[in-house]
């Protein structure tokens, strides 16, 4: 890995992490449901779907943008570990329905948004 790639990852990941911090801070929990985590994972999924949709449909996206936006920003923005911890916490607190809803919402919403981003890139 060269210096340029390293810097793109550091800057993209740092900006994604900052965005996650502020978005999750605005919407940390809604009636015991971790809405902030769902939102950041959803945004990152849409962006990643759109980015790779552009590539699939033949648009030129430089490797720098893929590294900066895809791996860096989306990687810093999304958070599987927080999602896992919040689900575990809900289970530990006996909030089984909310834990189930959190898993279903994160999986279905994020996959749907990857698909939507991918399709919208075609236009």
Curated annotation (Swiss-Prot):
User: Which terms does the record give in the GO molecular function aspect?
Assistant: fluoride channel activity; metal ion binding
Q: Which residues form a coiled coil?
A: none
| Keyword Aminoacyl-tRNA synthetase attributed | no
> InterPro entries in the record, alphabetically?
FluC (IPR003691)
- Chief subcellular location equals membrane
**Which GO cellular component terms are attached?**
plasma membrane
Transmembrane parts of this sequence: 7-27, 39-59, 67-87, 100-120
In what way is its activity controlled?
Na(+) is not transported, but it plays an essential structural role and its presence is essential for fluoride channel function.
Q: Which GO terms describe its biological process?
A: cellular detoxification of fluoride
Positions annotated to bind Na(+): 75, 78
Q: Known PANTHER family for this protein?
A: FLUORIDE EXPORT PROTEIN 1-RELATED
Q: What is the documented function of this protein?
A: Fluoride-specific ion channel. Important for reducing fluoride concentration in the cell, thus reducing its toxicity.
Stated family: Belongs to the fluoride channel Fluc/FEX (TC 1.A.43) family.
Supply the name of the protein.
Fluoride-specific ion channel FluC
Source species of the chain:
Pyrococcus abyssi (strain GE5 / Orsay)
């Amino acid at each position: 890995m060269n210096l340029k790639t390293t810097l793109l990852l550091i800057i993209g990941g740092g900006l994604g992490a900052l965005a996650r911090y502020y978005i999750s801070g605005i919407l940390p929990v809604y009636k015991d449901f971790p809405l902030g985590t769902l939102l950041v994972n959803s945004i990152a999924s849409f962006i990643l779907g759109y980015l790779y949709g552009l590539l699939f449909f033949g648009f030129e996206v430089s490797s720098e943008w893929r590294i900066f936006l895809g791996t860096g920003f989306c990687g810093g923005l999304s958070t599987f570990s927080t999602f896992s911890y919040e689900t575990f916490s809900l289970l530990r607190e006996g909030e089984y329905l909310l834990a189930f809803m959190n898993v279903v919402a994160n999986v279905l919403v994020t996959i749907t948004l990857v698909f939507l981003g991918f399709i919208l890139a075609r236009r």
